[in-house]
UniProtKB/Swiss-Prot annotation:
Pfam families: Proton_antipo_M. Its EC number is 7.1.1.-. Disulfide bonds: none annotated. It is found in: Plastid, Chloroplast thylakoid membrane. InterPro entries: NADH_Q_OxRdtase_chain4, NADH_Q_OxRdtase_chainM/4, NADH_UbQ_OxRdtase, ND/Mrp_TM. This is NAD(P)H-quinone oxidoreductase chain 4, chloroplastic.
Amino acid sequence: MNDFPWLTLIVIFPISAGSFLFFLPHRGNKVTKWYTLCVCSLELLLTTYTFCYHFQLDDPLIQLVEDSKWIFFFHFDWRLGIDGLSFGPILLTGFITTLATLAAWPVTRDSRLFHFMMLAMYSGQIGSFSSQDLLLFFMMWELELIPVYLLLSMWGGKKRLYSATKFILYTAGSSIFLLIGVLGIGLYGSNEPTFNFEISAHRSYPAALEIIFYIGFLIAFAVKSPIIPLHTWLPDTHGEAHYSTCMLLAGILLKMGAYGLVRINMELLPHAHSIFAPYLIIVGAIQIVYAASTSLGQRNLKKRIAYSSVSHMGFIIIGIGSITDAGLSGALLQIISHGFIGAALFFLAGTSYDRIRLGFFDEMGGMAVAIPKIFTMFSILSMASLALPGMSGFVAELIVFFGIITSQKFLLMPKILITFVMAIGMILTPIYSLSMLRQMFYGYRLFNAPNPSFFDSGPRELFVSISILLPVIGMGIYPDFLLSLSVDKVELIVSQFFYR
């Protein structure tokens, strides 16, 4: 047990501090923005301090545990803790949310509500990654849906209500399966309900019941990840959302689904996961090729990037299904890597849209001359997206490749076939990425600037782009730092649940 409730402070600080936004002057947009930025920065510093001075990297067990009775009638406990699995996603959440606050600087309409929604979403995401209680995990999972819906429906494009409704129908519908699974595990085999992750992980269930639980959780996490065919909400959502919201969606929200697959499906339901792992790998391989092919046919810039996100999530699914140390480590690295790259691409797409007010490729062209700084950053981060050596995506995908090849759960021919399909997807990735760059930045200039103040990237936008680029290069050159955070936990999961 930890004496000071560091994690509780980290979880409740953003939404608590955000509530004071409504006491700020209604017309003071600058005050609102600076206040939100200070809250996010302070939260990130607090998280970094807590992890640096109170977290032991060589301990695979849950640390900084906080366990308090909350609602006695429902046996609902406030139970928080972190380990190697949640360390990276929590830091990613803080980093991307802080930069998304900077990206949202042009937003002026209902500024206080907009920034409060971002901070509420921040608390929900940190709470999901640090929960050690199934019911608390579900509550935090639902908490961040409401801000996302409002951010979509109030600050989106022309079809924002359609995309927001589609988002909430998919996610709220899948949450029913999540709730059924949570209640099923919590109420099974005991006079007193227990939702403790640690206790649930050491329970055994009848095979049929474990499979039912697994399917329920899989549906919930497949929508959020997303896994085909439950991905269709994502392109519409990204196509209509403000690009700061897209940064949060691509950088953090999708990663919550992958985190749930590891934390609950792998750790709590290992026998069912052994049964479903081959199907996950097949779906992951199909998803890589399908989404990459579909991305190539998209005329809308943000929808093309959205489908590229779906394609890259396929590597995470394959890594989770491989049931190897290397595969799972590669999946966790890809979660962090794509969190940065996806957020950066949506940010740069949004800054381009701010200048020309065009979102379709057939209306663009020749932008490299007008905005050379944005062109340079877009080119570098597109290279990171297509897994250029020296970038984080290359290392993550290579480790996933190694994980599937060395897996003892599958025969040689299926592994060769899966590897071949993955290779096809990796060939398609540079095709749609380079095509995107060509259509946007090369050729004849097909557009007219909507106003005479058309200018290149400013200091704020350069700062956001470079702040994301540096970790991408850092992870590509020295991935061992990030891998070392989760290596002990990964070995514990794989050895304890699959080779015992």
